[in-house]
Amino acid sequence: MREIISIHIGQAGIQVGNSCWELYCLEHGIQPDGLMPSDTSLGVARDAFNTFFSETGAGKHVPRALFVDLEPTVIDEVKTGPYRQLFHPEQLISYKEDAANNFARGHYTVGREIVDPCLDRIRKLADNCTGLQGFLVFNAVGGGTGSGLGSLLLERLSVDYGRKSKLGFTIYPSPQISTAVVEPYNSVLSTHSLIEHTDVVVLLDNEAIYDICKRSLDIERPTYTNLNRLISQVISSLTTSLRFDGAINVDITEFQTNLVPYPRIHFMLSSYAPIISVEKAYHEQHSVPEITNSVFESSSVMAKCDPRHGKYMACCLMYRGDVVPKDVNAAVHSIKTKRTVQFVDWCPTGFKCGINYQPPTVVPGGDLAKVQRAVCMISNNTAVAEVFSRIDRKFDLMYAKRAFVHWYVGEGMEEGEFSEAREDLAALEKDYEEVGAEVEEDDEEEY
């Protein structure tokens, strides 16, 4: 088996995790207590869903997941929520003090206290696997736990499980909406270790997803639940081929191989289609070309940057539902002929496609309509540098005055770490600039 362990860190990671596991359970017909009426081969871990769920002798299906936070309230919600019986109590780790939006508390002082119990639990989860494939890590980099403890765990995973893939689903601060003044500090410090210790990171951003909810689903005032359900559809689409047997399956390592041209350039944009409310769905038919076109529109990207400002290096299209390869090939061909979607000159093919016949599942009472087919795109586009430059600018304004820095230094950090992380991010922006710019130099030689 090629198992995957999911690690949910901090409030954002845990709440996205709740939505994901709720959706996985619905997709596989697993009840909130972990029982699965349709599973006839109990105790035999041969089914595709066993990549994400382990089975006990009593027929319970337990997520291969760890939830960790430095304060108890969010984990307590899981412990009292509808899926409380799904998880093993030892998979839900909380501590008594908060990281207080401070990267240094999450990474040095408070995080250190909890990192060993987390790694012990991860080791138990890993021992329970026959062929561990990798980790999915969910966190946000604006707060203290997601950024600080998230980085610490990633660093330790690199040491203990160096050869395993690590995919991050990371929520970055939004341009307009802010939940903490020190977000730019936490994000820059955290990105420093994401560059080093993850293989692929999918960038998400609340503001972009708010806009999608308002525009496509007609939700006046979206809540985090609305956002997380949308995020969970993306993550579910990416992991479908790991959890179901499909026509063209895509392995986790295949994402890496196909999307990452250079090790540092592994920050991806994601988009999903069709995002459509129940009222509208009755009147529209979504063909493969239509949904394929819509994932390339800037309005469907789940991070605040415009892919038209950049060039694509590669993209992964994951179709699910009533889709045949012939339609996909035609849709991809028409995208390639469009002038709006620009690829870098050194990557002419640029498309990786996966198809899974399992149609998309929706949460009962949720916002999305049930559709016959859907597509999720993960793309490597140079425009993602816009996200970094925006955070850098805010970082520089604060750091020039050394504002709030004493809170970090007081928790055992050194000021040098700020400038080191900032320089690393500047280098990353430069890298993106260079991979996109290789075109112009060649053109000059031709004329």
Swiss-Prot record:
Q: What is this enzyme's catalytic activity, as reactions?
A: GTP + H2O = GDP + phosphate + H(+)
GO molecular function, a single term:
GTP binding
**Where are the active-site residues found?**
E254
Write out the annotated subcellular location: Cytoplasm, Cytoskeleton
UniProt cross-references to SUPFAM superfamilies, sorted A to Z: Tubulin C-terminal domain-like, Tubulin nucleotide-binding domain-like
Binding positions for GTP per the UniProt entry: Q11, E71, G144, T145, T179, N206, N228
> GO terms for biological process?
microtubule-based process
Q: Which GO terms describe its cellular component?
A: cytoplasm; microtubule
Stretches that traverse the bilayer: none
The UniProt keyword set, sorted, is: Cytoplasm, Cytoskeleton, GTP-binding, Hydrolase, Magnesium, Metal-binding, Microtubule, Nucleotide-binding
Q: Which InterPro entries match?
A: Alpha_tubulin, Beta-tubulin_BS, Tub_FtsZ_C, Tubulin, Tubulin/FtsZ-like_C, Tubulin/FtsZ_2-layer-sand-dom, Tubulin/FtsZ_GTPase_sf, Tubulin_C
| Listed CDD domains | alpha_tubulin
- What are the EC numbers? 3.6.5.-
The superkingdom of the source organism is Eukaryota
PANTHER family (alphabetical): TUBULIN
* Sequence similarity: Belongs to the tubulin family.
Q: What is the recorded name of this protein?
A: Tubulin alpha-2 chain
Taxonomic lineage per UniProt?
Eukaryota, Viridiplantae, Streptophyta, Embryophyta, Tracheophyta
